[in-house]
Amino acid sequence: MNILIFGPNGSGKGTQGALVKKKYDLAHIESGAIFREHIGGGTELGKQAKAFIERGDLVPDDITIPMVLETLKSKGANGWLLDGFPRNMVQAQKLWDALQAEGMKLDYVIEILLPREVAKNRIMGRRLCKNDNNHPNNIFIDAIKPNGDVCRVCGGELSARSDDQDEGAIGKRHDIYYNTVDGTLAAAYFYKDLAAKGMTKYIELDGEGAIDAIKDKLLAQLS
């Protein structure tokens, strides 16, 4: 089973992706990790990408797409879930073409829907536990709201990451994601159009629900 997953920062995309990975024993591949592995490993593609990054330039698609494809082939023998790529419609088309050329199926595309303001509040509401960063605490989500100023799980001291409180940075990331013309949603909608033609399957999930409820709805649509 091969899956693409889309969702804005704050939508719970990472959480749902991890649950799907565990359920179906998929390789959970995140776009940033692809760059780090190729550059850190000194691959030819990694060297080319590094040269662009060091100049402060975007890495061209003719380098990025082969890097992504190579990782999917090497790590995704039992299936994969790709998170964080593609980020625009051009990349979506190129990735689709590359998958077709390799004879690789794209079984499902998942989009987690969440209003922009809700996504922003969720990011700004995240709190980190001093004892364990994996303890979920968010002042804007009732199910995981902390007990006052302490962790709901262990009572540990809480803090907020500085970048989670930077509304300007959050806004820039969301400007890219919610752009339906040449942003990430444009990429998602490219696959939605393919699904309408029966070429893949497109799953839309309401991201405002509880984690378990979203998971149950998602797993019910995967087969």
UniProtKB/Swiss-Prot annotation:
CDD domains (alphabetical): ADK
Region described as NMP: spans on this chain: 30-59
EC number: 2.7.4.3
GO cellular component terms, semicolon-separated: cytoplasm
Broad class of enzyme this protein falls into: transferase
Annotated Pfam families: ADK (PF00406)
Positions of region (LID): 125-164
Keyword Cytoplasm found: yes
Family (UniProt): Belongs to the adenylate kinase family.
Name under which the protein is recorded: Adenylate kinase
Gene (UniProt): adk
